[in-house]
């Protein structure tokens, strides 16, 4: 993404396809993410800067180790400092744990606003790969909850200069 975005999304780490292309969220999860943003008139090309907590993929797609998160944290903090976003979306458990320092399950804290760096607002959201594994759109399902969250994100985004 290009700097000077009011909205950034922080994911976990590059996956296989992201490693190949050198861009975050380019596989099926990224395609779903693009559709989610498009549903409220946002696009990755002009509205959203996307990055990851980790800058390289852990072997065998395992959870990152604490020292791996720590090694990348300075770089992530620098990205946030340079971009000075108004809204930071924490996409998935690893991003939530890294930036909020909580081990609470994302289902309990998704959709809630937290104070972020530089007077920003942070919101944990479901990772699109989780949504791909949970296909139901019934009220209360992960996809239904994500729809509620993206509408709240758009509402707050629209109120910012």
Can you annotate each of these PLM segments?
Residues 1-161:
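A polyanion-binding, active-site-adjacent surface
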């Amino acid at each position: 993404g290009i700097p000077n975005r009011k909205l950034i999304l922080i994911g976990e780490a590059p996956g296989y396809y992201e490693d190949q292309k050198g861009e975050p969220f380019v596989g099926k999860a990224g395609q779903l993410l693009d559709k989610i943003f498009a549903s409220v008139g946002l696009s990755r090309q002009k509205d959203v800067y996307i990055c990851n907590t980790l800058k390289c993929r852990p072997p065998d797609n395992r959870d990152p180790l604490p020292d791996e998160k720590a090694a990348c944290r300075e770089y992530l903090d620098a990205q946030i400092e340079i971009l000075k976003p108004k809204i930071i979306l924490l996409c998935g458990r690893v991003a939530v744990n890294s930036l909020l320092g909580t081990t609470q399950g994302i289902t309990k804290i998704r959709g809630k606003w937290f104070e972020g760096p530089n007077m920003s607002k942070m919101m944990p959201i479901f990772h699109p790969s989780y949504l791909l594994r949970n296909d139901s759109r019934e009220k209360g399902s992960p996809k239904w909850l994500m729809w509620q969250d993206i509408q709240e994100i758009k509402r707050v985004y629209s109120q910012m200069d």
